[in-house]
Regions:
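Segments of Walker-type
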Residues: 1-98, 225
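P-loop NTPase catalytic core of nucleic-acid-dependent motor ATPases
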Residues: 52-168
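Conserved catalytic/switch belt of AAA+ P-loop NTPases
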Residues: 146, 185-209
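AAA+/SF3 P-loop NTPase mechanochemical coupling elements
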Residues: 162-165, 201-219
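Short glycine-/polar-rich loops that comprise or flank the Walker A/P-loop
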Residues: 168-170, 195, 213-216, 230-235
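Conserved AAA+/SF3 P-loop NTPase catalytic/coupling segment centered on the Walker-B
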Residues: 171-192, 224-233
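A short helix-turn-beta junction within AAA+ P-loop NTPase domains corresponding to the substrate/partner-engaging
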Residues: 227-245
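DNA transaction DNA-binding modules
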Residues: 276-425
Length: 425
């Protein structure tokens, strides 16, 4: 009781008279750039500005937090970094060169983005076939930015575990993601942009625990797993290629090679980060998207490395369009409507008030027609509307996306509600 009393007094005193100190994990803002905590026992930091990068041992006023699972980054190799340093990393990434450069740009962006209120993290979404080395790829990314004792994680079953992981890391990697529900998709968006998770306080009926969450994310999976356009909009999609059986090397051997190469690779990344900071004030995105700060980083990478203006930005924008389209088309209503429209000119089953390019009926008639498609597969899908009213609401949400697929939806009100499906050829 006396110990608790003393703790309470100390807490009260610090709340009223103590100084507020801003602390950071792994990456912190500083004048003209960032400082990166190497996590070593000598408390050394890497300071990156537009003038270059350097190791700081003493004199930094930046306060870093360290958690038990944090592991140290090695000291980068001495000297000025070059493109050859970055090329050392390519042998560990089974991707095409454009994807490789986009990943390098993502690494730089994450290293230059501390957890502050205004920052937004782009989610690295790896899509891979079996045998592409996606887990090793993910592990190496963590070892370059934010190594921890936990490493790659499986997605937890409760929000509290998600919050704890986010609070004690700069980057969290989730392995073998599958079809993500809307709840999980929204949660991942919240992690990337920053927010607050709530949970019931232990041993109480109405107490609430608040967990501030903000973290960079790496997701990987074999199948298409991003199904919400809002999540897709925040991602950098990267496809990994299968490794030929004749080219396979044991993971332990690859990791040994990587640990030898890591100081040189980090030197190259820190140098590129400095070059990006130098270029940022003079660039403007040619293909701005929702995550516009990442577009600016891509523009700065183009300027720093002599890549034709807009090359990386255009590729990023194109990939976003593809992943968003895949996400929209995975919606069961969207999928059913596309199938319905494709079959309409040829299938007498839909001859009710229709011609070759148009169908008109009530919402109930459309619900029945869509539900009967493909062996009634849609009707038994839990995500498919169970009433005509719900279907009408979903169609209004999907109206613009359907139009992009050449399907126009018109809503008419007379004595009865009517929906016209028109195919624009």
């Amino acid at each position: 009781d006396q110990i608790n009393f003393l703790f309470n007094r100390m807490e009260s005193y610090s709340a009223h008279f103590g100084e507020n100190i801003h602390s950071f994990y792994r990456v912190a803002p500083c004048e003209g750039g960032v400082e990166i905590d190497l996590g070593s026992s000598d408390l050394s930091h890497v300071k990156i500005t537009a003038e270059g990068w350097s190791i700081v041992y003493r004199g930094s006023g930046t306060k870093f937090l360290r958690f038990k699972n944090m592991q140290a980054l090695p000291l980068p190799a001495e000297g000025k970094g070059s493109i050859d340093d970055l090329n050392l990393l390519k042998k560990y990434f089974n991707t095409d060169w454009t994807s490789f450069i986009l990943v390098i740009a993502w690494i730089v962006y994450i290293m230059l983005t501390p957890k502050i209120h205004s920052s937004n993290f782009v989610i690295l979404a790896l899509n891979a076939v079996a045998g592409s080395g996606k887990s090793l790829f993910t592990k190496i990314l963590l070892l370059l930015i934010d190594p921890t004792a936990v490493g790659i994680r499986t997605f937890p079953q409760n929000k509290k575990a998600v919050g704890i992981a986010a609070k004690s890391s700069h980057v969290v990697a989730y392995d073998n993601m599958r079809r993500l529900s809307k709840f999980i998709s929204d949660l991942l968006c919240q992690l990337a942009t920053g927010g607050v998770l709530t949970d019931r306080k232990l041993y109480t009926d109405d107490g609430e625990t608040l967990i501030n969450v903000h973290v960079a994310l790496i997701l990987n999976g074999i199948h298409h797993y991003i199904e919400e356009p809002d999540l897709a909009d925040r991602c950098l999609p990267i496809n990994l290629e299968a490794i030929n059986s004749t080219d396979r090397i044991p993971e332990s051997e690859l990791l040994n090679q990587f640990h030898n190469d890591r100081p040189v690779i980090l030197r190259g990344i820190y140098q590129l980060a400095s070059d990006v900071l130098k270029a940022l004030p003079s660039v403007n995105p040619t293909h701005p998207v929702r995550m516009v700060e990442f577009s600016r980083t891509l523009a700065a990478v183009e300027a720093a490395k002599g890549i034709p203006v807009g090359t990386l930005q255009e590729e990023y924008a194109r990939r976003l369009q593809d992943i968003k389209r895949d996400a929209v088309l995975s919606d069961p209503v969207m999928e059913a409507m596309v199938e319905f429209a494709n079959r309409l000119p040829y299938d007498s089953e839909f001859s009710l008030r229709s011609d070759a390019t148009e169908w008109t009926g009530t919402p109930t008639e459309l619900l029945v027609a869509l539900g009967d498609l493909n062996g009634k597969r849609y009707r038994y899908n839990k995500q498919f509307p169970d009433s005509a009213i719900s279907l009408s609401k979903r169609l209004r949400v999907l109206e613009k996306d359907l139009l992009k697929e050449g399907i126009e939806v018109l809503f008419k009100r007379s004595k009865v509600r009517l929906i016209t499906i028109r195919i624009n050829t």
